[in-house]
């Protein structure tokens, strides 16, 4: 479908979905992230995810408004 727009490296086991959206620059604030996720605008690995606290791990692909972010494991 869409192309991988950017890859975000995490240095922990996981990053919560709302924090990832902010970190990746897909939204400006935690409040905006919460609204987007709870409104069904965010997909994780191709499926709509409405849990903003979802743990995203290396290999997960997050989509929002046609933008795609892949989570990678940093060193």
Task: Mark where each language-model region is.
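Short, Lys/Arg-enriched N-terminal segments with co-localized hydrophobic residues
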Residues: 1-4
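Short, contiguous acidic and Ser/Thr-rich linear segments
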Residues: 8-12
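A basic, amphipathic helix-loop patch mediating RNA/tRNA/ribosome contacts
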Residues: 13-58
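C-terminal structural segments of small proteins and small subunits
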Residues: 48-75
């Amino acid at each position: 479908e869409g192309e991988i727009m950017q890859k975000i490296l995490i240095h922990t086991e996981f990053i919560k979905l709302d924090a990832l959206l902010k970190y990746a620059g897909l939204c400006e604030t935690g409040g905006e992230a919460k609204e987007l996720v709870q409104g069904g605008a965010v997909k994780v690995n191709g499926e709509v995810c409405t849990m903003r606290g979802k743990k995203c791990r290396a290999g997960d692909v997050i989509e929002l408004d046609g933008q795609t972010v892949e989570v990678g494991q940093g060193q």
